[in-house]
Amino acid sequence: IENPNDADVADLTRRHMIHPLAQQEILITTYRPKLEDYDDHLYLVLHFPVVDAKTGAISSREIDFVVFPYNLITVHYQEIPQLDEFQQLLGEHEALRERTFGASSGQLLYHIIRQLFAVSKKELETIEKKVQSAQDRVFEGHERETLQDISHLRRDLLNFQKALKPQH
């Protein structure tokens, strides 16, 4: 579910019997990873770095997962292109869909997280290439022109780290 309002979350809670504490957590921003074990479901919060297609800036995006034995609910309040792409990929490839859904929602959760981290790894590799390019330009005598690029790279690396590192 993308960008639900209070009524959407209340309806979701009623239909799936989500624990009231998990319902409250879904409605607020959680700044660190979280895992709660309720009687018949898990509540999990993870953050992933997302590259803004327009600006190229990296920011952290939260995804809330409610995991039942045979049902998985994802909730997020900002666009997460990697999640949309994964859903589209599953829709287009029946064999992949069957393998991904498997015998339980845990298997689907595994594949979603794996895909999100795979995309994050590619984004990190892109940043590494930009860092190498900036270093090369500095050693070629283009220090002034490279200063702004380095500033943007530093911001991106800090945001990337913030998205993946548990905060204390």
For each feature predicted by the language model, list its residue ranges.
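Peripheral, non-transmembrane regulatory/ligand-interaction domains of membrane transport proteins
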Residues: 1-168
